[in-house]
Structure formats: structure tokens, C-alpha cells
Amino acid sequence: MPNWCINKLVIQGDPEDMEQLVRIVEGDSSAFSLNSVMKMPQELKDASSPERDGDTAKENIDKYGAKDWYDWAVKNWGTKWDVNAQIVSDVTSPMLPGLRTVSYEFDSAWNPPLNVYDVLAARFPNTNIYACWDESGCDFAGYRMYKNGELLKQVDQDSYSGRYSHYNPTDDIFDYFPSEKEVEKLRKQEEERRMADLNVQTALLRMQNLINNL
């Protein structure tokens, strides 16, 4: 029986990107699945028991880089078993209108699936990802934040501190790292505002010239 690590995964992005992401991570199960992000080879998945010895283990290592399903899961997902996590929150953020924020919660065996978060971030670089975990049995916790497909920040701490400092994040966790699409949108809005101000100034200058010429 493993120690269970509790996890929260919060993903934010443009509605179109988020629709594609949710469709991929949930697959056919309507729940977040590690296997939907990083697929275990069917040959290993269908094995009735671990194949750790002999020719079969060697063949599996040559083909898949792992002796059996357990070895593959730990190396690729970072945890022993797949998860089956339902969406616990799906909203449009009031802080950044037009962005969809989806949250999942789930338990994983022994460790958080950090490798899966890396793959998700790289596959969907226009999204923001916040992932946190708390494993009280071995007394560790932490969180990761991703932007532009890359790890922006990671914090590791003991379970007690982590439980109260990051496991229940507020909407403002994403305030300081908007996605590239949001940055571009804000950039365009700023350019439009600047051009509008310039047009007003030009019109006022022309009006002043007309008055001076009367």
C-alpha cells in the first residue's frame, strides 16, 4: 500500500487552447489521465504481472526503456499508477477576462507526476500551469509554475508548511505570468490606445492651427 500524495493541477489559457488541452488530457474517460498525456505501451499495460527477469525484461528494456509497466510508469509519469481526476473547477477568470481556468484534484502513489506536467507545459506553451502536491507520510510538499512551455518556478518544502501556503491558491496566482496570447492582446490594446491618443493630439493641433490662421 503506497503513501498517497494529494495533488492539485490548475491550467489557464485561451478558451480555444483549453478546449484542445482538456480533450487530450481526458481522452475517452472524461477525467484527467496520465496515460492520455504520456501513453504507456500497450504491451506493457496489458501484462498481467511485472516482467523483471529473463529475456522478456531485456526485450522490454530494448523496446521501451523499462522492464515492465511499473518500471515504465515510475520513469515516465514519476508515479506508480495512473490517476482518474475529475474537473473540480472550470471558470472564466475574473482577473483576466476571456481566459479559461480548469482545476483538477487527484491522489497519486508516492510522488506527484512531475514528468507529465513537463510534457503538458511543452505541448501547450500558450497556457499557464500551476501544479502543487502534499505527501504528509514522507513529509514533503511543493509546487511548480510553468509559462511559455518552460518551468518558471519550483518550491519544495515540508508537508505542514505546504498545506497552508500553496494548496489552496487564489485566482491571483496567474497575475504575474499571463500567456503569450494574453501578452499580445494587451500589447495590441496598448498600441490602439496610443494611436487613439496620437489621433486626438493631431486633431487638436490642426484645430489650433485653423484658429491661429483666422
Regions found by a protein language model. Name each.
Residues 1-214:
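Intrinsic low-complexity, intrinsically disordered or marginally ordered coil/linker segments
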